[in-house]
Amino acid sequence: MNILRRGRLGSNVKEDVMKFTTSLEFDKEIFESDILCDIAHTTMLVEQNVISEENGKKIIAELKKIAEQSMESLNLDPSLDDIHMVIESELIKELGEDVAGRMHTGRSRNDEVATDLRLSLRKKVLEIITHLIAMEKNMLRVSREHKETLTVGYTHLQQAQPVTFGHHILSHVSAIERDISRFFDTYNRINISPLGCGAMATTGFNLNRKRTQELLGFYDLIENSMDGVSSRDFVVETMANISMLGTNLSKICEELVVFSSAEFNTIEIANEYTSTSSIMPQKKNPDVAEITRAKLSTLNGELVTVLTIMKALPNTYNRDLQEISPHLWKSVYTLIDSIQMVDGMISTVKVNKERMKENAEKNYSTATELADTLVRECGIAFRMAHGIVGELVKRSIEEKVEIKEIILEVLEKNNLSLSQEKIDTALDPFENVKLRNVIGGPAPKEVERAISSFNEKISSHKEKLDEKIAEIESVKKNLLK
């Protein structure tokens, strides 16, 4: 029986109510964090002379024994509500209530669970960043391999201008970079301590909140006790980051599906990320990209669900907040799995260079550079050049002739002239690419510079990541030693 009920409520509780309200199913995500929180709190209680050193040592020793077990080995009776009471009941069973019952002095489950969530989530955020860095490294490798692989870029899914496949890959790297930065920023807001806020008004015991902050490796305190127990904005912020990253990854999945189709035929997804048809033996379907795309879509739904749960809740703690947790952890694991799938598909993709080159050489992808050449060489306004080249394209389509066959005629009609060398250069897609050597352009030299710049950022990220991982590992080591 839940020891909390014996006073005010009595032992009579319906089984279906217990099963409906328990959080034990998803409390496995905070099991270790709860023990670390208990040890830190107990250590501080001893130091502040709130409980005796003898009792504190007994409690901490038993907590360390529990930490060595799996959560499943404990008595997960739904009547205990949650992992906090499971652990406390385990302590009482081993030490007796007069000793174990002192651990919760000056603390509520409200500030306890808020602390546990932050401890567990900060670790998962670093895991996400770890996977993103690994994926970014692989994307940069592919980009370098294809910094001179000519292809065509699209707007409105219509062929637009010549680029390189390496430059195209870097467009996704650039977005992933912002995602990594967002997670690092969010980490700083996750890693602040609500422990000591109590139920919602702190406590009359002489607690040292700064000490538990230090023991648990938090960067700062949430000072206001009401905000400390009720705030879940760090969850929403993390899930918003997850949703944004999921959107970026879904774009990659979409391209893998579209560009691997027979109509595009510019890439081929590795066999291990595809399946075939039960009836059509020729099929090679991009199932992993499709399933990943679908799973990433669910992240938006999880975010909206959490926002809806939180909307208009009374200050401060409400049990509604419990229902946020399963949506958070589902989002985290869906994202991590999806990153690994996208990473694998990009790392093993086969590139059809001939098909990419063929696409870049047709459908007037060099028209912009031809207009730019008229501006540079003839001194006319760009809008005028735009109209002249537009006329060239129209006649080429209608008369079924190449632009180079009619360009001199059109230029002469407009009292303009260009050398054949300038015309050939303007209409050559790879020359187009080489000309675009400005920052962020597709020229191979600029792509190489950008790759080097991104690698420097990765090194900086890795250094920061390793530092934070070491901080967390140090907390665990010191508390469980």
Curated annotation (Swiss-Prot):
EC class of the enzyme, as a word: lyase
EC number(s) recorded for this UniProt protein: 4.3.2.1
Protein name (Swiss-Prot/TrEMBL): Argininosuccinate lyase
NCBIfam families xref list: argH
Annotated catalysed reactions: 2-(N(omega)-L-arginino)succinate = fumarate + L-arginine
Family per similarity comment: Belongs to the lyase 1 family. Argininosuccinate lyase subfamily.
Cytoplasm in keyword set: yes
Organism in which the protein naturally occurs: Methanococcus maripaludis (strain C6 / ATCC BAA-1332)
Gene encoding the protein: argH
Transmembrane segments: none
